């Protein structure tokens, strides 16, 4: 049945709900406070609502959200009065606060902002809160962001600029960044707020002239570097440095690493580089395996990048390549301490450690699992999840996920593992992983790395001649085992196969393309496609993983002319999504291999060497 039709907003329903004994957003008596990770579990017991009430709230939610965005204050107030303490209410309140801030309704804004849990307050609402109080604490950090900000944060930065509360160098660097990202209107507004508009002979006008080399089309020109060289005498050190950083970034992302380094090396003020530019400066040196140069680049990165396990690991590798094993070990220790990510695992292996997938906690107590399942906030998420499954409603499923994250965000580690068990038993697999993944000391790898549908997956992996651990590593990243998962571009199911690809596969292996929408058919198609990608890409798992995400042609284009270490290939993939995807899939596969007692449990060996382009 159509939930929107059945549960449409009506004044009578709202009035009845207000008079009912539901929990209001101001009722904090039933909330479970955050607990120390060392405390024993105290299972929350928030008031439960009936299924019809949960679905009623969901039916009204989208209308209330639309009302919040258009500033229909009465409708929003009516919804919040009866919606209870939920992710739905929190989302609506955030949207309403954005609208109130945009309209300058500061008295109502301040009143409603107090009702919002700080953990759920979105960045734009925080910006409006500072505008409402005349504070500019966030502006100093926001001005260092060189791409588009939410409207409220843009207003905060411009207000701080007008009040003379920003570092001038940072502010003009943001103007350049906006210009390079085609955000000309925001760049113009900030320049005006700084008192130097783009018109006339002001600094703003000189910044605007940089579009001739840093604009999205201009930087692609073969003459961009010569144009910048001819302009340099009229540019400040900061302007010139930023512009060379833009050109270096473009060349590095197009795998022209020698040229990229030559441009980056003309940057005289490296404080002008954005994080993205700095990382690609390092990737250019990494791809060419210029270890001395790489270590120097990493050591000049801002603190936040130097603390990233990516660059801790590669700094360690660069020290090792230069023969400094003691300093290399120090960096590996730092990277290995960052968790269970790609570089933590690789760093651990450099220190002689292999991943350990032995649980250090017992399974959750069955009584605790039952009590957790009865918690009102958990139950709300489960109601939405089960109804989304039966109706194949992707939007409702996303809201169920939001409610689960809302319900568990203050949980200690014991409760997270109990919640993960509840989710697993209800086949809410993605949220089982979400909860289990958030523990740091109490570890249950069977919940972190779930393996549902195992008989089917292993059977089709074996038929395709590929490693089941690799298949599970890919499914965990693609869909988190959500049966009806559908991407924004139309990829379907557990293995996120595109319908057009499914038709092609079906014709080759004697299936109906409609089997894409079944568990069995989706896994069969996905494993066949993985094997085909591997065969087409020189039998290399790393390239096949990249090809599964971005297409085999791109994976082939990213090869070097000579063999390249798999981790270097992965780190220098130009697409952020694919770069992260490959690292996560291969890390997942290594953990699954350990859980499945396979012999291949080294991530470095699994990454191997990517052959040269032929």
What name fits each language-model region?
Residues 13, 21-463, 469, 489, ...:
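Alpha-helical solenoid repeat scaffolds
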Residues 227-234, 262-264, 269, 322, ...:
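Catalytic glycan-binding domains that act on GlcNAc-containing polysaccharides
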Residues 2-25, 585:
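Gram-negative bacterial Sec-dependent N-terminal signal peptides
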């Amino acid at each position: 049945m159509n939930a929107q039709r059945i549960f449409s907003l009506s004044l009578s329903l709202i009035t009845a709900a207000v008079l009912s004994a539901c929990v209001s957003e101001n009722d904090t008596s039933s909330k479970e406070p955050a607990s120390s990770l060392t405390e024993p579990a105290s299972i929350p017991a928030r008031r439960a609502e009936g299924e019809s009430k949960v679905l009623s709230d969901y039916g009204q939610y989208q209308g209330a959200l639309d009302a919040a965005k258009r500033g229909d204050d009465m409708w929003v107030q009516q919804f919040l009065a009866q919606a209870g303490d939920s992710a739905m209410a929190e989302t609506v309140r955030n949207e309403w606060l954005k609208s109130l801030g945009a309209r300058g309704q500061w008295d109502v804004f301040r009143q409603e902002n107090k009702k919002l849990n700080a953990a759920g307050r979105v960045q734009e609402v925080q910006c409006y809160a500072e505008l409402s109080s005349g504070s500019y604490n966030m502006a100093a950090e926001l001005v260092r962001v060189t791409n588009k900000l939410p409207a409220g944060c843009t207003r905060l930065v411009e207000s701080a600029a007008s009040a003379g509360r920003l570092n001038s160098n940072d502010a003009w660097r943001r103007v350049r960044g906006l210009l390079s990202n085609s955000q000309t209107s925001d760049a113009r507004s900030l320049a005006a707020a700084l008192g130097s508009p783009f018109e006339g002979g002001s600094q703003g006008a000189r910044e605007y002239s940089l579009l001739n080399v840093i604009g999205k089309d201009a930087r692609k020109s073969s003459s961009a570097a010569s144009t910048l060289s001819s302009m340099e005498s009229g540019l400040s050190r900061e302007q010139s440095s930023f512009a060379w950083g833009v050109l270096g970034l473009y060349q590095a992302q197009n795998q022209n690493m020698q040229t990229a380094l030559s441009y980056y090396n003309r940057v005289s003020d490296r404080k002008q580089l954005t994080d993205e530019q700095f990382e690609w400066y390092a990737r250019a040196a990494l791809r060419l395996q210029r270890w001395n140069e790489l270590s120097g680049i990493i050591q000049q990165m801002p603190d936040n990048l130097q603390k990233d396990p990516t660059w801790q690991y590669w700094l360690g590798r660069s020290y090792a390549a230069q023969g400094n094993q003691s300093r290399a070990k120090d960096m590996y220790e730092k990277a290995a301490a960052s968790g269970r990510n790609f570089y933590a695992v690789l760093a651990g292996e450099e220190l002689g450690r292999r991943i350990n997938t032995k649980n250090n906690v017992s399974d959750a107590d069955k009584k605790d699992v039952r009590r957790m399942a009865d918690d009102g906030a958990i139950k709300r998420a489960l109601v939405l999840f089960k109804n989304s499954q039966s109706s194949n409603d992707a939007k409702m499923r996303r809201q169920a996920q939001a409610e689960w994250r809302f319900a568990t965000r203050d949980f200690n580690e014991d409760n997270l593992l109990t919640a993960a068990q509840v989710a697993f038993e209800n086949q809410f697999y993605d949220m089982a992983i979400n909860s289990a993944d958030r523990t740091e000391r109490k570890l249950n790898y069977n919940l972190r790395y779930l393996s549902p549908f195992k008989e089917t997956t292993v059977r089709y992996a074996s038929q395709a001649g590929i490693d089941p651990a690799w298949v599970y590593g890919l499914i965990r990243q693609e869909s988190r085992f959500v049966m009806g998962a559908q991407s924004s571009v139309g990829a379907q199911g557990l293995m996120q196969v595109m319908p057009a690809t499914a038709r092609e596969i079906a014709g080759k292996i004697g299936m109906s393309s409609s089997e894409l929408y079944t568990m069995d058919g989706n896994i069969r198609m996905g494993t066949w496609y993985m094997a085909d990608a591997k065969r087409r890409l020189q039998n290399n798992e790393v390239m096949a993983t990249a090809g599964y995400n971005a297409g085999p042609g791109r994976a082939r284009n990213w090869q070097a002319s000579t063999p390249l270490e798999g981790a270097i290939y992965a780190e220098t993939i130009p697409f952020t999504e694919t770069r992260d995807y490959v690292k996560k899939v291969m890390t997942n596969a290594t953990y699954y291999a350990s859980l499945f007692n396979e012999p291949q449990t080294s991530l470095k060996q699994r990454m191997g060497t990517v052959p040269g382009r032929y």
